[in-house]
């Protein structure tokens, strides 16, 4: 068996297993399982980020960063799911947590001698990891718990997480297929030589088409969205997914890494899997709750159009 076929089979097997677990967790409404899935992927992605820095010999407080990441992801689920805090309260919690992390990082230096002081880059690399992975990934929890529940108290936000993930992956699929078939004009060759403008527009077309298709197929499950929202969200999420993919490519190129890790055979690391979602999840923002409770999961772009 050739290396190319073996890579394809590994990628296919990893994709089937991963999507089976993810879809079952999302569609079943299993809240503890969903929390473990999101927190686990976020922490593994953060670990891969720090390991890439280690491979490049870039200093960082890896253990402190992982502890803060776990607190941020776990805290979001606890505050939203178990405490049932309102949007303003959870955002206050996150801001307070980030400020506390910053305070601890600087306070740590006060107990060291001049010879032991770590450079500013160490603190910057550590804190950047928190802003890059666990903080944006925690928006997935917000989508679940800030969406109105059913009269019986069951969450409905998992359907919008499914919408988010599928539209994001439609964007990735559109970029790959269009770029492979007709791609000729490089998008940003110094970052990712295989990315093309044709793939860029293909990604937007697929994400819009996928969003409209999902709203048409599941009108009752996605009752807070209509076709106009689907088009706008498709464009916003498609563009954000492209930027997220390029951002990770820039990070890997800076660290001299081909993949973020080997967590998923044939695919790469967890960070390779969630790179686009890190940028698309915050696009479905709670600011639209200022309209009324039935618009919780409509993106800020839709909110602005209604102003």
Q: Which residues does each predicted region cover?
A:
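Interfacial helix-loop-helix junctions of multi-pass membrane proteins
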Residues: 247-263
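Juxtamembrane boundary at the C-terminal end of a transmembrane helix
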Residues: 286-290
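Short helix-coil transition sites and intra-membrane helix breaks within transmembrane domains
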Residues: 167-170, 240-244
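Hydrophobic alpha-helical transmembrane segments of integral membrane proteins
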Residues: 131-132, 261, 278-279
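Single conserved hydrophobic/aromatic residue that forms the stacking wall/gate
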Residues: 291-307
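Re-entrant/interfacial helical elements at transmembrane boundaries that shape
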Residues: 179-181, 252-255, 278, 282-283
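Alpha-helical transmembrane segments that form the membrane-embedded catalytic/substrate-binding core
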Residues: 14, 175-176, 195-207, 241-244, ...
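Membrane-embedded alpha-helical bundles of polytopic integral membrane proteins
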Residues: 1-235
């Amino acid at each position: 068996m050739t290396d190319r076929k073996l890579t394809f089979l590994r990628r296919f097997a990893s994709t089937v297993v991963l999507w089976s677990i993810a879809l079952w967790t999302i569609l079943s409404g299993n809240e503890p399982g969903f929390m473990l899935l999101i927190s686990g992927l976020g922490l593994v992605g953060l670990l891969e980020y720090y390991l890439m820095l280690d491979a490049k010999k870039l200093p960082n407080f890896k253990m402190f960063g992982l502890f803060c990441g776990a607190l941020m992801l776990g805290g979001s689920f606890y505050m939203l799911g178990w405490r049932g805090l309102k949007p303003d309260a959870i955002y206050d919690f996150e801001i307070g947590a980030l400020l506390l992390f910053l305070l601890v990082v600087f306070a740590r230096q006060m107990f060291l001698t001049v010879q032991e002081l770590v450079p500013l880059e160490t603190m910057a690399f550590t804190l950047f990891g928190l802003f890059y992975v666990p903080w944006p990934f925690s928006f997935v929890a917000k989508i679940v718990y800030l969406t109105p529940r059913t009269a019986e108290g069951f969450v409905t936000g998992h359907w919008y997480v499914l919408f988010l993930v599928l539209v994001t992956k439609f964007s990735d699929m559109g970029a790959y297929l269009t770029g492979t078939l007709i791609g000729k004009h490089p998008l940003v060759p110094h970052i990712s030589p295989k990315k093309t403008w044709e793939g860029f527009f293909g990604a937007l077309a697929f994400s819009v088409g996928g969003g409209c298709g999902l709203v048409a197929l599941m009108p009752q499950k996605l009752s807070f969205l209509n076709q106009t929202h689907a088009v706008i969200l498709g464009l916003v999420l498609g563009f954000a997914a492209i930027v997220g993919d390029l951002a990770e490519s820039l990070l890997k190129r800076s660290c001299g890494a081909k993949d973020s890790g080997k967590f998923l055979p044939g695919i790469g690391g967890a960070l390779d899997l969630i790179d686009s979602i890190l940028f698309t999840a915050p696009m479905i923002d709670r600011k639209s709750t200022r309209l009324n409770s039935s618009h919780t999961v409509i993106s800020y772009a839709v909110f602005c159009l209604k102003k």
